[in-house]
Amino acid sequence: MKSDIEISHQAPLLPIQDIAKKINVDQDDIEFYGKYKAKFSQSIWSKITSKKQGKLVLVTSINPTPAGEGKTTVTVGLGQALNQLGKSAIIALREPSLGPCFGLKGGAAGGGYSQVVPMEDLNLHFTGDFHAITSANNLLAAMLDNSLYQGNPLNINPKKIIFKRCMDMNDRALRHLVIGLGGDKDGVVREDSFVITVASEIMSILCLAKDINDLKQRLARIIVAYNYEGEPVSAEDLNAVGAMATLLKDALNPNLVQTLENTPAIIHGGPFANIAHGCNSLRATKLALQLADITVTEAGFGADLGAEKFFDIKCRIGDLQPDCAVLVVTTKALKYNGGLGKTQWDHENLTALATGIENLGKHIENLKKYGVPVIVTVNAYVTDSAKEHEFIAQYCQQRGCRFAISQVWEKGGAGGIELANQVIDTLENDAPQFQLLYPDNMPLKQKIETIAQEIYGAKGVTYNANAQEMLTKIEDMGFGHFPICMAKTQYSLSDDPALLGRPTDFTINIREVYVSAGAGFVVSLTGTINTMPGLPKKPAAMAMDVDDHGAIKGLF
């Protein structure tokens, strides 16, 4: 089997204006970024408002192995399969972050014969959206520190500054630092830290903003610090909103590319799901829904993180109505959740599978709580056994759940026909009864406990003193109606990454709480999760290079 990058290099790509034609978009309504990439122009929105909205399919997964479950691969393959069956389908995905690309993943645009292309562009700089987000974020940080230096007219308490600089890279050395060192002309000395761009509030704001006016209103609400009286200081107070919006003007528009089989793909935004809300932009999803009969999108990591936030944050804020959920599982992840180490995943082991499959059962239960029909699909590997697939199929049937084998990594769209037919049948015959997990007016603490108990299966929640105090303060500030964005490990239903399968009798520990007033949610940090990842011992970057002809090697 060829590598992903070799497959992508050999793919016959269509000019991007031809991809636009497939979804009835005139080339006057796209801005070209070379031959194979484009941004939708602002002019597109007035032309699609009268179109009937299509169906929305969410792809999610069980708790993954460190290598992931292949949600993006299945999303791409499903979109290709739907188009092969004559359906008008668009896939809507997040843009990959440079951090994981150079860290563990080595790229994130699907895999095998189900990829979004051009693969190198997508993984490296793409259309510059992340650069714009990083720049807007760091402009606000610079204006904040400049206000401190220029006499501190807003009476900001340097020990109560909460807005962080960001960079789209895994760099643990930036988690704790001191800035302003030098002399009197070098700024005010204080402790600071960086977050990765995809965990920044501005990334979430871009992904939840409905239009440029909504973007500016959200930017204005960002709380950067508290003054000596304990009152919040906002980006609006710093007069930074106009300049930030200027940097983000083009980044607000979704991007158009294609898959290996020339299926249209809208790529926009990229918040992490373990430390942010984990979904592509609301504008991209709404655009896709107006342009195609079926939109296939994904939410990051397992359904306990990405899907919960997709429903309770993105669908709540964007008034979206999902029509079904595809739950991706691999035999490897089931055996991993059943206690087997990496070297044993490729061997048939029905005992470990039977233990680990309880993780799948919990995710099926969780998705049904939202009232959406569920289709389980095995992202098949050549090392899987027929007995393993049969065991999973029977488990799903016993729970009244549709099931399909997916071979889209190996066969592209042709390997997703079984899944696509299940999706089509579901959309035509199984009416969703979508509902949110909790109402807006539920107290914040109760929202956290509802997620912990209903979705994770925890017996309770503990809070440290600072988190407890902050929850009260946030409600007093008028943000008690916001949804919760849980920051939690992706590897377990609990906040302990080593607690696999379907754990019971555990407690979720809340160590920090803060409000993202611009994004419109309250972040609750659990366990040891942090907002600036580090590189592994052998980063994927060590295997990357570019040859004399400009061809990139080493992206997976």
From Swiss-Prot:
Q: Does the keyword ATP-binding apply?
A: yes
Keyword annotations for this protein?
ATP-binding, Ligase, Nucleotide-binding, One-carbon metabolism
Q: What class of enzyme is it?
A: ligase
Query: Can you state which reaction this protein catalyses?
Result: (6S)-5,6,7,8-tetrahydrofolate + formate + ATP = (6R)-10-formyltetrahydrofolate + ADP + phosphate
Single annotated GO MF: ATP binding
The GO annotation for biological process reads: tetrahydrofolate interconversion
Q: Where does ATP bind?
A: T65, P66, A67, G68, E69, G70, K71, T72
Q: What is its EC number?
A: 6.3.4.3
Pfam families named in the record: FTHFS (PF01268)
Which pathway does this polypeptide act in? Answer: One-carbon metabolism; tetrahydrofolate interconversion
The UniProt similarity line reads: Belongs to the formate--tetrahydrofolate ligase family.
What is the name attached to this protein's record?
Formate--tetrahydrofolate ligase
| Species of provenance | Proteus mirabilis (strain HI4320)
The record lists the lineage as: Bacteria, Pseudomonadati, Pseudomonadota, Gammaproteobacteria, Enterobacterales
